[in-house]
Regions:
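Substrate-positioning beta->alpha
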Residues: 123-124, 152-157, 171-193, 199-203
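NAD(P)H-binding glycine-rich loop region in Rossmannoid oxidoreductase-like domains
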Residues: 16-19, 25, 29-68, 72, ...
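Glycine-rich Rossmann NAD(P)(H)-binding loop
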Residues: 148, 170-175, 202-209, 220-223, ...
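Conserved Rossmann-fold NAD(P)-dependent oxidoreductase catalytic core, especially the SDR/UDP-sugar
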Residues: 68, 72-116
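Catalytic helix-loop patch of NAD(P)-dependent Rossmann-fold dehydrogenases
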Residues: 99-146, 167-169
């Protein structure tokens, strides 16, 4: 909007309507299960960032929203005459349970991953690539570990687990990770509105690599959250996550397990990625550093 764009945003409630309007955008009441070309209207570019990102849920939830929802968004956007479709994805499309070390966009997707979030996002990417054409260009952006002020995913979890005493570092939090501050992702989206190759994927990252303990500890500390030092080895976390899933499914428990296979995996495997492609083809460079981002969180 600061650049003169008119922005519409998908909304599912009156509360979301108000939040979107307060930011100067126009709310459009729909969701991934009923979106049509009429909802897209005369928009020239679509930024698709809605997804089912929960650690736990009904078996079909990830497919319904991440695959079927993306397919509907693509169809609605193309029918409405949109020119560009920017799909916000994730490094999780690569996960099979392995470490990711010095990885770029040539690394193969994992459409048969054992983790529902990973395989559904990987297959959604495949849909986006196949939809690319001369008159409807699709671009994929892959952030890793999105963080920053206003976070509604990591910080509530850290607060709850610290308060309950459930928090434990897996393998001491020694796994190294790339990260993506929300401002850097927004900058990449702005660039992708006019730059980038159709059908291409781009990692969007902060400068540098840190251990999970360094990064999570710093984010928690910026909000006055103190995390305990307790640890559990990765193999034990993997077993605990798998066992919990079996028990929860077997007994139809409605609560979320304390640990899942996916959460055990992402907290113990390295995710060191390269963003040279985004820098070369999008002209991307981080607009905010990690230390500055943490300082802003402390001041918020």
């Amino acid at each position: 909007m600061a650049g003169g764009h008119q922005v519409r945003a998908m909304s599912r409630s009156e509360k979301s309507d108000a939040a979107i309007a307060a930011l100067g955008a126009a709310p459009v009441r729909c969701d991934l299960e009923d979106v049509t070309a009429a909802h897209v209207g005369d928009s020239e570019a679509i930024v698709h960032c809605a997804a089912f990102v929960e650690q736990w849920g009904p078996v079909d939830a990830w497919k319904r929203f991440n695959i079927d929802g993306t397919e509907r968004m693509l169809a609605a956007s193309r029918e409405a005459g949109a020119l560009r479709f920017i799909h916000i994805s994730t490094e999780s499309v690569l996960w099979r349970g392995q470490h990711l070390r010095d990885v770029d966009e040539t690394y193969p997707r994992a459409p048969n991953s054992p983790y529902p979030y990973s395989w559904t996002k990987a297959r959604a990417e495949e849909l986006v690539v196949r939809a690319n054409g001369a008159e409807f260009q699709t671009i994929i952006l892959r952030p890793r570990f999105i963080w920053g002020p206003g976070d509604t995913t990591l910080l509530p979890t850290l607060r709850a687990m610290a308060a309950s005493g459930q928090w434990m570092w897996i393998d001491g939090g020694r796994a190294r990770t790339s990260t993506t501050h929300i401002d850097n992702l927004i900058h990449a989206i702005e660039l992708a509105l006019t730059k980038g190759g159709g059908g291409e994927a781009y990692f969007v990252l902060d400068d540098g690599v840190r251990t999970l303990r360094e990064m999570i500890g710093a984010i928690a500390g910026s909000q006055g959250i103190s995390l305990p030092d307790r640890e559990i080895p990765a193999w034990a976390a993997d077993v605990a996550g798998a066992t919990a899933e079996i028990v929860w499914r077997l007994f139809g428990l409605r609560s979320e397990p304390p640990l899942t296979r996916f959460s055990a995996m992402i907290m113990s495997r390295e995710a060191v990625l390269r963003d040279g492609k985004a820098r070369a083809e999008l002209g991307y460079a981080p607009v905010i550093g990690v230390e500055e981002g943490l300082a802003r969180m402390r001041q918020a």
